[in-house]
Swiss-Prot record:
Subunit and partners: Component of the 7-subunit TFIIH core complex composed of XPB/SSL2, XPD/RAD3, SSL1, TFB1, TFB2, TFB4 and TFB5, which is active in NER. The core complex associates with the 3-subunit CTD-kinase module TFIIK composed of CCL1, KIN28 and TFB3 to form the 10-subunit holoenzyme (holo-TFIIH) active in transcription. An additionnal subunit, TFB6, plays a role in the dissociation of the SSL2 helicase from TFIIH after transcription initiation. Interacts with TFB2.
Membrane-crossing residue ranges in chain numbering: none
Protein's organism: Saccharomyces cerevisiae (strain ATCC 204508 / S288c)
Superkingdom of this protein's organism: Eukaryota
Compartments where located: Nucleus
Similarity field: Belongs to the TFB5 family.
Alphabetically ordered keywords of this record: DNA damage, DNA repair, Nucleus, Transcription, Transcription regulation
One cellular component term from this protein's GO annotations in UniProt: transcription factor TFIIH holo complex
Tagged with keyword Cell membrane: no
Name of this protein: General transcription and DNA repair factor IIH subunit TFB5
InterPro entries: TFB5-like_sf, TFIIH_TTDA/Tfb5
Protein's GO biological process: nucleotide-excision repair; nucleotide-excision repair, preincision complex assembly; transcription by RNA polymerase II; transcription initiation at RNA polymerase II promoter
Function: Component of the general transcription and DNA repair factor IIH (TFIIH) core complex, which is involved in general and transcription-coupled nucleotide excision repair (NER) of damaged DNA and, when complexed to TFIIK, in RNA transcription by RNA polymerase II. In NER, TFIIH acts by opening DNA around the lesion to allow the excision of the damaged oligonucleotide and its replacement by a new DNA fragment. In transcription, TFIIH has an essential role in transcription initiation.
Length: 72
């Protein structure tokens, strides 16, 4: 029997999917279903939170050469 779930379909590359799953591991109510390598079904009320957390995580990993110049 098929089951229906309300969710937001997220399409992303595998590296972003891994980050979303990492966020979900801490909260455990974000990802409803892993569909394949590039698609997730996400709780619609958590989409903005996921975007915010992804931006925060990705901004920590950005190299900015201006930061080095300021520290010297």
């Amino acid at each position: 029997m098929a089951r229906a779930r309300k969710g937001a379909l997220v399409q992303c590359d595998p590296s972003i999917k891994a980050l979303i799953l990492q966020i979900d591991a801490k909260m455990s109510d974000i990802v409803l279903e892993e569909l394949d390598d590039t698609h997730l079904l996400v709780n619609p009320s958590k989409v903005e939170f996921v975007k915010h957390e992804l931006n925060r995580l990705l901004s920590k990993n950005i190299y900015n050469p201006m930061d080095e110049e300021e520290n010297q």
